[in-house]
């Protein structure tokens, strides 16, 4: 605190202007302040408390095997923004229990909604100190607040499910029976299906023209990702021994982070591109577990956020825009959509498409077929309109017997 006051008195900047990869501006603590925080932490006495007693957990210090996606770098869990001390301790116990059965990403979602809930309680129900005091009325008011909040996560069913899971776990641990029966099924809003978008051929050409000018291994990674049609996590965790040949056909083995491993045939060109990527990594880092590695930590895969930052910086620098005149976002899933739509245009059956995309079920294929039909309609609309105009002009010369046709078509 004294250092902070001295810096303020010296007119040294204590807040920095930061620009995100999306071009948005925010303000945060200056590098100088963060530096002093780290110095004080290093020089301060060692915290000998058990890890679960601390307000910030180092995951590596927990006696639990953490289930994580290796393309995301999650090192800590932060409870400091759960403002009520008793609720914070209750939340810690629940998080520790859930970590033994759930992936770290799921637990992070539960912790995020608990922070939002804690902030709401602090403002609207400041007398509530423990989860044992939360009743149905408080919950309903919060859910209304959540559903009307102007954020991208408003009324998101996953948030409500995460809150329910967290409060019910707390109820079981502390025998707060009320929490186990607090929610009813109608509390969970229906999921809003996101618009299923896909890049046009022109958009893909513009993107790839710039991607190929980026760092060679990142460019290879993104092109391979497009050609495989995999999830980005599956691409970034490809193994150096993934390539095989079966009956003269190049094959690739893909380890799906979410489900299982599977094989699929690939072209000779893609096999060569993969081989070049493997050789690049071996020459630069030696034997590694993954083809695309984190340069600072070669034992880990290339990180999703590192790729995202570089691609978005390129888009901002080049002012690269889509067909609607908007700057491109970083949509690795859009490459997968493009791949899926192309498979439907080849008239493959649903089972084959699902296999090539690594889907366990066939029901997702309908989205690709629907988008393919929509694209066909959009791309042929001008031609179909010209054909219709020619027909209507002919009808206009054919007399009264076709008057009803003209009226039905809305033609003057």
Q: Where are these predicted regions, by residue range?
A:
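Conserved tyrosine-mediated DNA breakage-rejoining catalytic core shared by Y-recombinases
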Residues: 228, 237-275, 363, 411-412
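Single conserved hydrophobic/aromatic residue that forms the stacking wall/gate
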Residues: 1-9, 14-16
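Active-site-proximal segment of tyrosine recombinases
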Residues: 234-236, 330, 340, 347-359
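Basic, Lys/Arg- and aromatic-enriched nucleic-acid-binding interface segment
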Residues: 202-232, 336
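Active-site/catalytic core of tyrosine-dependent DNA strand-transfer enzymes
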Residues: 269-326
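N-terminal DNA-binding recognition helix of tyrosine site-specific recombinases/integrases
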Residues: 22-65, 104-105, 116-118, 151-182, ...
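Flexible interdomain linker/hinge and immediately adjacent N-terminus
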Residues: 56-79, 175-209, 253-260, 292-301
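Acidic, low-complexity interaction regions
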Residues: 106, 243-244, 298, 305-321, ...
